[in-house]
């Protein structure tokens, strides 16, 4: 029993004494997050488009759910419109039902949207990156999940997929993605689109929504249409008709033989809408 007159001397030492006992250690106060690291309060409001907008009232994708888990969590890029979060949860559940491995969810948007250093879009809560790594998944520590960098599927010459990594299940996953509610398009590397054109059987209408774009060798980029209740949101033109397995796809590979142009001057993005500037403050 500790004598009462000794307690004042022992209290400052308690955190060190209990450090090896997680259940007993004194909880350290967590400082409040800066305002801009939290979503703006109030109803959901999307302003402008994915390359120059913002979102108020965003919700966060849970770190784990049926058929998925998030990675690189310290970036806090898992915020989006409620319909985007629901669609990703649907994708995880459908992937699980189809017998696919757990999916890794990567970036959505910042808590209030707006520009991101690693993306040109992802600004309005309507974009999400989903890893194409379909290897078996195992428990990871938080540090491992934060540092995870799944491998790409494209061969070094960029003209096709890596046969050691490409699987029939990739066709199934990408087809599942095109059936999500509100989906506008899925961006993948041109080599992945080319392989889908070769492998897809039966009804191939879903290929129209798979669009080739630079990069995107290790993940698919899901872009969702503006929700009907967001009049200030700006949609992109819809994908052109057809499967997209024609000369328009071949163009991407023809460019591999063209010498790269001289570096262009840095592009200065247009100013954000006034609402977004006020919402984001110093983020802009």
For each predicted feature, which ranges?
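Boundary at the C-terminal end of the N-terminal hydrophobic targeting segment
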Residues: 25-29
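Extracytoplasmic
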Residues: 98-100, 123-127, 217-219
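Bacterial N-terminal signal peptides that target proteins for export
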Residues: 2-14
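Catalytic cores and adjacent binding grooves of peptidoglycan-active enzymes
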Residues: 30, 140-284
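N-terminal signal peptide c-region/cleavage motif recognized by signal peptidases
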Residues: 20-22
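Active-site acidic/histidine clusters and adjacent loop/turn architecture
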Residues: 40-106, 166-175, 183
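Short, surface-exposed glycine/acidic/tryptophan-bearing loops
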Residues: 117-135
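Extended, low-complexity, intrinsically disordered C-terminal regulatory tails
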Residues: 33-36, 87-118, 187-209
């Amino acid at each position: 029993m500790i004598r009462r007159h000794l307690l004042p001397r022992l209290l400052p030492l308690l955190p060190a004494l209990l450090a090896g006992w997680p259940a007993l250690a004194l909880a350290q106060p967590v400082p409040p997050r800066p305002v801009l690291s939290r979503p703006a309060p109030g109803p959901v409001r999307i302003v402008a488009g994915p390359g120059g907008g913002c979102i108020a009232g965003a919700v966060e994708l849970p770190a784990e759910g049926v058929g998925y888990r998030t990675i690189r969590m310290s970036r806090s890029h898992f915020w989006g419109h409620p319909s985007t979060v629901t669609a990703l949860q649907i994708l995880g559940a459908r992937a699980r039902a189809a017998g696919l491995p757990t999916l890794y969810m990567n970036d959505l948007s910042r808590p209030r949207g707006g520009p991101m250093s690693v993306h040109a879009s992802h600004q309005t809560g309507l974009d999400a990156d989903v890893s194409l790594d379909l290897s078996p998944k195992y428990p990871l520590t938080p540090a491992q999940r934060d540092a995870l960098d799944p491998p790409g599927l494209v061969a070094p010459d960029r003209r096709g997929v890596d046969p050691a990594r490409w699987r029939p299940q990739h066709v199934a996953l990408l087809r599942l993605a095109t059936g999500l509610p509100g989906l506008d398009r899925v961006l993948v590397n041109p080599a992945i689109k080319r392989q889908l054109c070769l492998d897809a059987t039966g009804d191939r209408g879903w290929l129209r929504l798979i669009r080739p774009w630079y990069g995107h060798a290790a993940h698919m980029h899901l872009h969702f249409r503006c929700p009907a209740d967001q009049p200030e949101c700006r949609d992109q033109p819809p994908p052109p008709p057809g499967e997209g397995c024609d000369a328009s796809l071949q163009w991407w590979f023809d460019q591999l033989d063209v010498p790269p142009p001289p570096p262009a001057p840095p592009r200065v993005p247009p100013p954000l809408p006034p609402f977004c500037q006020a919402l984001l403050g110093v983020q802009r």
